[in-house]
Amino acid sequence: MTPPAPALLGTSVTQTTPPAIEVRDLVRRFGEFTAVDHLSFAVRPGEVFGFLGPNGAGKSTTIKMLCTLLQPTDGAAFVNGFDVTRDPARVRESIGIIFQDYSLDDRITAEENLRFHSMIYHIPRDERAERIAQMLAMVNLSDRAKDKVRTFSGGMKRRLEIARGLLHYPAILFLDEPTVGLDPQTRQTIWSHIHELRKRVGITVFMTTHYMDEAENCDRIGIMDHARLIALDTPAALKADMGGDVIRLRTADNAATVALLAREFGVTAREEADMLRFEVEHADTFVPRFLRHAHIDVQAVEITPPTLNDVFLRLTGHAIRDEGADSNDRLRAIMRRRGGRA
Protein backbone atom coordinates (compact mmCIF):
# COMPACT_ATOMS: atom_id res chain seq x y z
CA MET A 1 0.00 0.00 0.00
CA THR A 2 1.32 3.46 -0.90
CA PRO A 3 2.03 5.50 2.24
CA PRO A 4 0.24 8.82 2.70
CA ALA A 5 2.10 11.77 1.25
CA PRO A 6 3.66 14.39 3.49
CA ALA A 7 2.51 17.99 3.26
CA LEU A 8 3.41 19.21 -0.21
CA LEU A 9 4.64 22.75 -0.78
CA GLY A 10 2.21 24.99 -2.62
CA THR A 11 -0.47 22.50 -3.68
CA SER A 12 -4.18 22.05 -3.11
CA VAL A 13 -4.50 18.69 -4.90
CA THR A 14 -7.07 16.58 -3.08
CA GLN A 15 -7.91 12.90 -2.98
CA THR A 16 -10.64 13.49 -5.58
CA THR A 17 -8.22 15.21 -7.98
CA PRO A 18 -5.02 13.16 -7.95
CA PRO A 19 -1.93 15.08 -9.02
CA ALA A 20 -0.38 14.64 -12.43
CA ILE A 21 3.02 14.66 -10.72
CA GLU A 22 3.74 14.04 -7.04
CA VAL A 23 7.21 14.35 -5.52
CA ARG A 24 8.02 13.29 -1.95
CA ASP A 25 11.34 14.13 -0.34
CA LEU A 26 13.22 13.54 -3.59
CA VAL A 27 17.03 13.45 -3.36
CA ARG A 28 19.77 12.94 -5.92
CA ARG A 29 23.43 12.77 -4.93
CA PHE A 30 26.55 12.22 -7.01
CA GLY A 31 29.06 11.06 -4.43
CA GLU A 32 29.37 13.89 -1.91
CA PHE A 33 27.61 16.37 -4.21
CA THR A 34 23.86 16.88 -3.64
CA ALA A 35 22.19 17.95 -6.88
CA VAL A 36 18.59 17.73 -5.59
CA ASP A 37 17.90 18.11 -1.88
CA HIS A 38 14.61 16.75 -0.45
CA LEU A 39 12.07 18.18 -2.89
CA SER A 40 8.35 17.79 -2.16
CA PHE A 41 5.64 19.25 -4.39
CA ALA A 42 2.69 18.30 -6.60
CA VAL A 43 1.57 19.39 -10.06
CA ARG A 44 -2.12 19.62 -10.90
CA PRO A 45 -3.60 18.01 -14.02
CA GLY A 46 -3.76 20.48 -16.92
CA GLU A 47 -1.38 22.91 -15.22
CA VAL A 48 1.57 24.72 -16.78
CA PHE A 49 4.08 24.32 -13.98
CA GLY A 50 7.57 25.78 -14.04
CA PHE A 51 10.84 25.49 -12.19
CA LEU A 52 12.68 28.82 -12.15
CA GLY A 53 16.31 29.04 -11.13
CA PRO A 54 19.87 29.55 -12.31
CA ASN A 55 21.86 26.88 -14.10
CA GLY A 56 23.11 24.34 -11.59
CA ALA A 57 20.13 24.74 -9.23
CA GLY A 58 18.91 21.16 -9.77
CA LYS A 59 16.09 21.78 -12.25
CA SER A 60 17.31 19.52 -15.04
CA THR A 61 18.32 16.78 -12.60
CA THR A 62 14.78 16.80 -11.22
CA ILE A 63 13.26 16.48 -14.69
CA LYS A 64 15.60 13.60 -15.51
CA MET A 65 14.42 11.73 -12.41
CA LEU A 66 10.76 12.38 -13.25
CA CYS A 67 11.37 11.11 -16.79
CA THR A 68 13.15 7.98 -15.41
CA LEU A 69 16.50 8.94 -16.95
CA LEU A 70 18.10 9.16 -13.48
CA GLN A 71 17.39 7.04 -10.41
CA PRO A 72 16.61 9.00 -7.24
CA THR A 73 19.05 8.52 -4.38
CA ASP A 74 16.18 8.79 -1.92
CA GLY A 75 12.53 9.79 -1.78
CA ALA A 76 9.74 8.98 -4.23
CA ALA A 77 8.09 10.46 -7.31
CA PHE A 78 4.89 9.54 -9.15
CA VAL A 79 4.06 10.60 -12.71
CA ASN A 80 0.51 9.97 -13.92
CA GLY A 81 0.17 7.74 -10.85
CA PHE A 82 3.16 5.56 -11.78
CA ASP A 83 6.21 5.22 -9.53
CA VAL A 84 9.26 6.44 -11.46
CA THR A 85 11.41 3.74 -9.85
CA ARG A 86 9.02 0.77 -9.96
CA ASP A 87 7.10 1.53 -13.18
CA PRO A 88 9.54 3.39 -15.46
CA ALA A 89 8.10 1.92 -18.67
CA ARG A 90 4.57 3.09 -17.78
CA VAL A 91 5.91 6.55 -16.97
CA ARG A 92 7.72 6.82 -20.32
CA GLU A 93 4.64 5.74 -22.25
CA SER A 94 2.61 8.56 -20.74
CA ILE A 95 5.01 11.49 -21.16
CA GLY A 96 6.64 13.58 -23.87
CA ILE A 97 10.10 15.08 -23.38
CA ILE A 98 11.87 18.04 -24.97
CA PHE A 99 15.37 18.72 -23.67
CA GLN A 100 17.68 21.71 -24.07
CA ASP A 101 19.79 20.16 -26.83
CA TYR A 102 18.28 19.28 -30.18
CA SER A 103 17.83 15.56 -30.69
CA LEU A 104 16.34 15.51 -34.18
CA ASP A 105 18.05 13.75 -37.07
CA ASP A 106 18.80 16.65 -39.40
CA ARG A 107 19.75 14.35 -42.29
CA ILE A 108 16.13 13.34 -42.84
CA THR A 109 12.89 15.23 -43.29
CA ALA A 110 10.51 16.53 -40.65
CA GLU A 111 7.96 13.90 -41.64
CA GLU A 112 10.54 11.10 -41.44
CA ASN A 113 11.60 12.20 -37.95
CA LEU A 114 8.00 11.97 -36.77
CA ARG A 115 7.44 8.65 -38.52
CA PHE A 116 10.44 7.14 -36.73
CA HIS A 117 9.08 8.41 -33.40
CA SER A 118 5.65 6.94 -34.16
CA MET A 119 7.24 3.52 -34.63
CA ILE A 120 9.16 3.74 -31.35
CA TYR A 121 5.92 4.49 -29.48
CA HIS A 122 3.98 1.78 -31.34
CA ILE A 123 1.40 4.14 -32.79
CA PRO A 124 -0.87 1.95 -34.96
CA ARG A 125 0.31 1.91 -38.58
CA ASP A 126 -3.06 3.04 -39.95
CA GLU A 127 -3.03 6.12 -37.65
CA ARG A 128 0.53 7.32 -38.26
CA ALA A 129 0.05 9.46 -41.37
CA GLU A 130 -2.97 11.28 -39.94
CA ARG A 131 -1.27 11.80 -36.57
CA ILE A 132 1.90 13.17 -38.20
CA ALA A 133 -0.10 15.55 -40.41
CA GLN A 134 -2.09 16.72 -37.38
CA MET A 135 1.01 17.52 -35.33
CA LEU A 136 2.81 19.28 -38.18
CA ALA A 137 -0.26 21.44 -38.74
CA MET A 138 -0.47 22.20 -35.03
CA VAL A 139 3.03 23.73 -35.05
CA ASN A 140 2.63 25.35 -38.49
CA LEU A 141 5.15 23.14 -40.27
CA SER A 142 2.90 21.36 -42.77
CA ASP A 143 4.55 23.12 -45.70
CA ARG A 144 7.99 21.92 -44.55
CA ALA A 145 7.07 18.26 -43.99
CA LYS A 146 9.23 17.03 -46.89
CA ASP A 147 12.21 19.29 -46.12
CA LYS A 148 15.35 18.05 -44.42
CA VAL A 149 15.64 19.28 -40.84
CA ARG A 150 19.12 20.69 -41.52
CA THR A 151 17.40 23.50 -43.46
CA PHE A 152 15.28 24.55 -40.46
CA SER A 153 15.89 27.54 -38.20
CA GLY A 154 16.34 27.04 -34.46
CA GLY A 155 12.74 28.01 -33.79
CA MET A 156 11.42 25.61 -36.43
CA LYS A 157 13.47 22.76 -34.97
CA ARG A 158 12.06 23.48 -31.53
CA ARG A 159 8.51 23.48 -32.91
CA LEU A 160 9.19 20.15 -34.63
CA GLU A 161 10.48 18.73 -31.34
CA ILE A 162 7.25 19.84 -29.66
CA ALA A 163 5.29 18.05 -32.39
CA ARG A 164 7.39 14.94 -31.88
CA GLY A 165 6.95 15.09 -28.10
CA LEU A 166 3.16 15.19 -28.52
CA LEU A 167 2.83 12.64 -31.31
CA HIS A 168 1.90 9.75 -29.01
CA TYR A 169 -0.64 11.89 -27.10
CA PRO A 170 1.18 12.05 -23.74
CA ALA A 171 -0.63 13.20 -20.63
CA ILE A 172 2.38 15.28 -19.53
CA LEU A 173 4.91 17.21 -21.61
CA PHE A 174 8.31 17.88 -20.00
CA LEU A 175 10.22 20.88 -21.35
CA ASP A 176 13.78 21.41 -20.10
CA GLU A 177 14.80 24.99 -20.98
CA PRO A 178 12.67 24.72 -24.15
CA THR A 179 13.67 28.04 -25.71
CA VAL A 180 17.28 28.45 -24.58
CA GLY A 181 19.33 30.16 -27.29
CA LEU A 182 16.28 31.40 -29.21
CA ASP A 183 15.48 35.07 -29.81
CA PRO A 184 12.60 36.63 -27.80
CA GLN A 185 10.18 36.67 -30.75
CA THR A 186 10.74 32.97 -31.47
CA ARG A 187 10.40 32.18 -27.76
CA GLN A 188 7.03 33.92 -27.72
CA THR A 189 5.92 31.96 -30.79
CA ILE A 190 6.85 28.68 -29.08
CA TRP A 191 4.84 29.67 -26.02
CA SER A 192 1.82 30.53 -28.15
CA HIS A 193 1.94 26.97 -29.49
CA ILE A 194 2.27 25.50 -25.98
CA HIS A 195 -0.76 27.42 -24.68
CA GLU A 196 -2.78 26.47 -27.76
CA LEU A 197 -1.93 22.80 -27.18
CA ARG A 198 -3.06 22.98 -23.58
CA LYS A 199 -6.39 24.50 -24.62
CA ARG A 200 -6.92 21.86 -27.30
CA VAL A 201 -5.93 18.68 -25.49
CA GLY A 202 -5.69 19.60 -21.79
CA ILE A 203 -2.09 18.48 -21.48
CA THR A 204 -0.07 19.06 -18.30
CA VAL A 205 3.19 20.95 -18.93
CA PHE A 206 6.22 20.77 -16.63
CA MET A 207 9.09 23.04 -17.63
CA THR A 208 12.34 24.48 -16.37
CA THR A 209 13.66 27.91 -17.23
CA HIS A 210 15.91 30.72 -16.13
CA TYR A 211 14.02 33.25 -18.30
CA MET A 212 11.69 35.52 -16.34
CA ASP A 213 9.26 36.04 -19.22
CA GLU A 214 8.86 32.27 -19.61
CA ALA A 215 8.16 31.86 -15.91
CA GLU A 216 5.36 34.44 -16.24
CA ASN A 217 3.64 32.04 -18.67
CA CYS A 218 3.25 29.41 -15.94
CA ASP A 219 0.20 28.89 -13.75
CA ARG A 220 2.56 28.26 -10.82
CA ILE A 221 6.31 28.31 -10.46
CA GLY A 222 8.67 26.68 -8.01
CA ILE A 223 11.82 28.67 -7.34
CA MET A 224 14.95 26.53 -6.98
CA ASP A 225 18.36 27.52 -5.70
CA HIS A 226 21.28 25.34 -4.59
CA ALA A 227 19.32 22.09 -5.04
CA ARG A 228 16.37 23.19 -2.88
CA LEU A 229 12.83 24.34 -3.61
CA ILE A 230 12.55 27.62 -1.72
CA ALA A 231 9.13 28.93 -2.84
CA LEU A 232 6.12 27.80 -4.86
CA ASP A 233 3.09 29.85 -5.90
CA THR A 234 1.57 31.72 -8.81
CA PRO A 235 3.79 34.44 -10.34
CA ALA A 236 1.31 37.09 -9.19
CA ALA A 237 1.26 35.81 -5.60
CA LEU A 238 5.04 35.59 -5.39
CA LYS A 239 5.36 39.20 -6.55
CA ALA A 240 2.57 40.35 -4.24
CA ASP A 241 4.47 38.86 -1.29
CA MET A 242 7.20 41.43 -1.92
CA GLY A 243 4.87 43.92 -0.25
CA GLY A 244 5.81 47.08 -2.11
CA ASP A 245 7.61 48.78 -4.98
CA VAL A 246 11.22 48.44 -6.05
CA ILE A 247 13.28 51.63 -6.12
CA ARG A 248 16.65 52.02 -7.81
CA LEU A 249 18.75 55.12 -7.18
CA ARG A 250 21.98 56.45 -8.57
CA THR A 251 23.61 59.11 -6.39
CA ALA A 252 26.89 60.99 -6.20
CA ASP A 253 27.73 59.06 -3.01
CA ASN A 254 26.07 55.65 -2.84
CA ALA A 255 27.83 54.63 0.38
CA ALA A 256 26.52 57.71 2.20
CA THR A 257 23.05 57.10 0.77
CA VAL A 258 23.01 53.51 2.08
CA ALA A 259 23.85 54.80 5.56
CA LEU A 260 21.22 57.56 5.32
CA LEU A 261 18.48 55.16 4.22
CA ALA A 262 19.23 52.85 7.13
CA ARG A 263 19.55 55.62 9.72
CA GLU A 264 16.68 57.91 8.75
CA PHE A 265 14.21 55.58 7.04
CA GLY A 266 14.95 52.09 8.35
CA VAL A 267 15.51 50.86 4.79
CA THR A 268 18.20 48.37 3.78
CA ALA A 269 19.63 49.08 0.33
CA ARG A 270 22.07 47.02 -1.69
CA GLU A 271 24.34 48.03 -4.53
CA GLU A 272 23.70 46.75 -8.05
CA ALA A 273 26.44 47.99 -10.38
CA ASP A 274 26.27 51.79 -9.95
CA MET A 275 22.70 51.79 -8.56
CA LEU A 276 21.18 51.25 -5.13
CA ARG A 277 18.17 48.94 -4.89
CA PHE A 278 15.58 48.62 -2.11
CA GLU A 279 11.87 47.96 -1.60
CA VAL A 280 9.33 50.18 0.13
CA GLU A 281 5.58 50.45 0.37
CA HIS A 282 4.04 53.47 -1.36
CA ALA A 283 7.06 54.56 -3.40
CA ASP A 284 5.02 57.49 -4.74
CA THR A 285 5.12 59.16 -1.31
CA PHE A 286 8.48 57.78 -0.15
CA VAL A 287 10.57 59.23 -2.99
CA PRO A 288 9.51 62.89 -2.51
CA ARG A 289 10.06 62.55 1.25
CA PHE A 290 13.50 61.03 0.68
CA LEU A 291 14.51 63.76 -1.78
CA ARG A 292 13.50 66.48 0.70
CA HIS A 293 15.69 65.00 3.44
CA ALA A 294 18.58 63.47 1.53
CA HIS A 295 20.76 66.50 0.70
CA ILE A 296 22.61 64.16 -1.65
CA ASP A 297 22.99 64.59 -5.39
CA VAL A 298 20.46 62.09 -6.81
CA GLN A 299 21.29 61.41 -10.45
CA ALA A 300 18.59 58.88 -11.34
CA VAL A 301 15.47 57.36 -9.79
CA GLU A 302 13.62 54.31 -11.09
CA ILE A 303 10.40 52.94 -9.57
CA THR A 304 9.01 49.61 -10.76
CA PRO A 305 6.56 47.00 -9.50
CA PRO A 306 8.37 43.87 -8.29
CA THR A 307 9.43 41.31 -10.89
CA LEU A 308 10.20 37.63 -10.49
CA ASN A 309 13.87 38.57 -10.54
CA ASP A 310 13.19 40.80 -7.53
CA VAL A 311 11.43 37.87 -5.84
CA PHE A 312 14.42 35.63 -6.50
CA LEU A 313 16.79 38.31 -5.22
CA ARG A 314 14.76 38.70 -2.01
CA LEU A 315 14.66 34.94 -1.40
CA THR A 316 18.27 34.10 -2.25
CA GLY A 317 20.31 37.27 -1.92
CA HIS A 318 21.48 37.12 -5.53
CA ALA A 319 20.04 37.75 -8.98
CA ILE A 320 19.04 34.92 -11.28
CA ARG A 321 21.86 34.50 -13.73
CA ASP A 322 24.15 31.77 -14.93
CA GLU A 323 25.54 30.80 -11.54
CA GLY A 324 25.67 27.09 -12.22
CA ALA A 325 29.24 26.83 -13.46
CA ASP A 326 30.74 26.18 -10.04
CA SER A 327 28.16 23.52 -9.17
CA ASN A 328 28.48 21.84 -12.54
CA ASP A 329 32.27 21.90 -12.37
CA ARG A 330 32.16 20.24 -8.93
CA LEU A 331 29.80 17.58 -10.25
CA ARG A 332 31.99 16.85 -13.27
CA ALA A 333 35.07 16.59 -11.07
CA ILE A 334 33.30 14.12 -8.77
CA MET A 335 32.16 12.00 -11.71
CA ARG A 336 35.65 11.98 -13.23
CA ARG A 337 37.11 10.72 -9.96
CA ARG A 338 34.51 7.94 -9.98
CA GLY A 339 35.31 7.08 -13.60
CA GLY A 340 31.96 8.32 -14.91
CA ARG A 341 30.65 11.24 -16.90
CA ALA A 342 28.44 14.05 -15.66
Model regions: which residues?
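Conserved ABC ATPase "signature" region
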Residues: 115, 119, 126-144
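Conserved catalytic motifs of ABC-family nucleotide-binding domains
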Residues: 169
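Helical segment within the ABC ATPase nucleotide-binding domain
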Residues: 188-201
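ABC ATPase "signature
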Residues: 232-233
